[in-house]
Curated annotation (Swiss-Prot):
Disulfide bonds: 28-77, 40-90, 76-81
Naturally occurring in which organism (per UniProt): Bombyx mori (Silk moth)
Protein name: Bombyxin G-1
Keyword DNA-binding attached: no
SUPFAM superfamilies (UniProt xref): Insulin-like
PROSITE patterns found in the cross-reference section: INSULIN
Keywords of this entry: Cleavage on pair of basic residues, Disulfide bond, Hormone, Secreted, Signal
Family to which this protein belongs: Belongs to the insulin family.
């Protein structure tokens, strides 16, 4: 009886933690830019909307920290990454 309870407990714990893991995905091109804008500024784009043309994107500015490490495209387009990695570039 104790074995059955232990097995059920282990299955329950495994099931509840496996759904919380974020899946790494590839973010390239426009998808990368739109995802970064959403993560960093809360901006969401409509594909046909030109409202944000000419908007200055501070995330594209060079900083010492960004120059020292690989670019975001290297980290998240060539190799899958999570949104936690993406948000580290904000």
């Amino acid at each position: 009886m104790k074995l059955i309870i232990f097995v059920v407990f282990c299955i329950t714990i495994y099931g509840s933690t496996s759904g919380q893991q974020e899946v790494a995905r590839r973010y390239c091109g426009r998808h990368l830019a739109v995802t970064m804008a959403d993560l960093c500024f809360g901006v969401q784009f409509d594909k046909r909307n030109t409202q944000y043309e000419g908007y200055h994107w501070p995330l594209l500015a060079y900083s010492e920290e960004r120059i020292k490490r690989q670019g975001i495209a290297d980290e998240c387009c060539l190799v899958p990454c999570t949104t936690n990695v993406l948000s580290s570039y904000c």
